[in-house]
Every structure is written in C-alpha cells, then in structure tokens.
A protein has these predicted regions:
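Active-site flanking residues adjacent to catalytic metal/cofactor-binding acidic residues
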Residues: 8, 34, 107, 146-148
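Structured beta-strand-rich core segments of catalytic domains in phosphoester-bond hydrolases
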Residues: 30, 34-112
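Catalytic metal-binding/acid-base residues of hydrolase active sites
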Residues: 11, 37, 110, 149-152
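N-terminal, active-site-proximal structural segment of metallo-dependent hydrolase catalytic domains
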Residues: 1-49, 53-68, 257-266, 270-273
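Metal-dependent phosphoester-hydrolase catalytic domains
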Residues: 136, 151-273
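Acidic/histidine-rich, metal-coordinating catalytic segments
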Residues: 140-153
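Secondary-structure boundary elements
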Residues: 95-101, 129-143
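Extended recognition/assembly regions associated with phosphoester-bond processing machinery
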Residues: 18, 38, 108-110, 116-122, ...
C-alpha cells in the first residue's frame, strides 16, 4: 500500500488554501503541520473543500496542539502514543488495514537563535530517548521521524550516537545499531543528505538564511525525514516542494518566498507499506 505524507512548518501563516492545493495535487494521505495560524477545524475544512477528500483531524494528548495531524478517513488512523511536556514531540501509532503498525514521531525543536549547539544536542538526546521509550512501550521498532529539527544533517544532535544517530546511507543503517564505549545505539537512516545542494532535483534545502557571519551555509536542511532501518527500503519518493499548484513558493532566486508564504519549504514523501 503506497501512502503519501506531507510535513510543513507554516510559520504561523494562514496557508490552509495553499496547503489544500498541495495535498490535492500530490494526493497526500497524511498531513503533518507545525506553527499553524488557524484552528484545526479551519484547516480540516480547507482540506475537504471542493472535492471528496474526507480528511479527519487526529488530536494529540497535548491540547496546545503545536502539531496538527490529518489523515484521509478510512485510509489510516493516527493514535496518540506520547506527547512531551514542551510540545516539541508527538508520537502517533499509524494503523492501516492489513499493514504492520508503525510509529510517526513529529518534531519541532528549538532554533539556534534561542539554543546553543550544546542545548540543541541535549534536546536531541532527550528526543531520542523519548522515541526509544515509546518504541519499547508499544513493541513497535518501525519509526518515522519527521519535522523541523532546526539542525542540519551533519549537526551533532542529528548525527551523534547519543542523539538521533542518523546516517547518510542505507548500507550504514543496515547495521541496525552501533556500539560506542560498550553502549549500543540504534540507527536512523537520513535520506535528506541526498537533497542538499544544486546537483539535486528541486530546492537546495528547506530553509535559506543569509547572515552576516564568517560561517554561513545559506541553504539548510532543517526539515527532515528520518527512518528506522526497518522502514528505509519502503521509501519510494522524497521531494522538497517549491510550488502550490501554479503558485511558486520560492522567489526568482529560488529562496523560500517568506513574505507571502512560509520561510520553510514543505517536504513530501511516499512509503510502500
């Protein structure tokens, strides 16, 4: 069964109509959003407007609803398993008819504006621990982590063993885990490495920042999809989107058009489950 997913940090902009256009044109089944500007029912109405989309909102345990998740009715059920206190993480059990259950961890970590690199590393370590505990509690090792990490794939919080431990190739992730100083750490596979720069199809990253500092990457891959090794061969497609129908989400220079839309570009991916 081919399932299509979309994640977008909306930057607190009322982009529900543009979101609905993307969802319709890409035939998205599961929608995951951060930094919404309007109530979940308004987003649900936009998703279901003009066509028989039949999207349903699935609330989490944290009633602040920093994340909102929707699924096509009858296609999949998103059962809340864990929401952390700060609202940085929600973990849902994805139930599909005739398919092994998987976990979807949706995350939005603090940015480097407010957190030092050490702070981000510690937040990632806490995130990794919460996900692993939920995997143990549910007995489900098949996890997708998706969201705005506010870190690049090479950041210690993403790549190091004590944090998310996300590696750039399937060959590495196929080892399942790595032992460091007598402690075993499970891998995530990070396919976002393959979408960096201008030798890839689509934008060079998901977030652009031009800062007057000696070290400036300009393009960043803050929005990421990580998969446990058990799911990495299920990945069929992964795109950073730069349009909503006929409307471009980027400027003529290819940067996110943050004056009209979000400063983050949405990510779309498909899994054969």
């Amino acid at each position: 069964m081919l399932i299509s997913f979309l994640f977008w940090n909306l930057m607190k902009c009322p982009l529900q109509d543009h979101l609905a256009t993307i969802v319709s044109s890409h035939n998205v089944d599961i929608v995951m959003l951060a930094e919404r500007a309007v109530a979940p029912d308004e987003i649900e109405s936009a998703l279901n407007k003009g066509a028989i989309q039949d999207f349903q909102f699935f609330p989490g345990e944290n009633r602040s609803e920093k994340f909102v998740l929707f699924s096509r009715a009858g296609k999949a059920t998103l059962i809340s398993q864990f929401d952390d206190y700060s609202g940085s993480l929600t973990v849902r059990r994805l139930q599909l008819p005739g398919v092994l259950e998987i976990l979807i961890a949706v995350v939005h970590l603090p940015s480097a504006i407010n957190y030092s690199e050490v702070d981000q590393l510690l937040a990632s370590a806490k995130l990794a621990g919460d996900i692993e505990q939920t995997e143990r509690d549910t007995g489900i090792p098949r996890t997708i982590l998706v969201g705005d990490l506010n870190m690049n794939p090479f950041h210690p919080g993403v790549a190091s063993a004590g944090a998310l431990h996300a590696v750039m190739t399937k060959q590495l992730a196929a080892r399942m885990e790595r032992t460091v100083k007598g402690v075993s750490y499970r891998f995530f596979y990070n396919p976002m490495w393959g979408h960096f720069g201008d030798r890839t199809v689509g934008p060079a990253g998901t977030y652009h920042l031009s800062a007057a500092k000696p070290l400036n990457y300009f393009w960043n891959m803050y929005d990421q999809v990580l998969l446990r090794p058990e799911l990495m061969y299920s990945l069929q497609d992964l795109q950073i989107l730069d349009s909503a129908g006929i409307e471009s989400l980027v400027t003529q220079n290819g940067k996110p058009k943050s004056s009209a839309y979000s400063d983050h570009l949405p990510i779309f991916f498909q899994l054969e489950l």
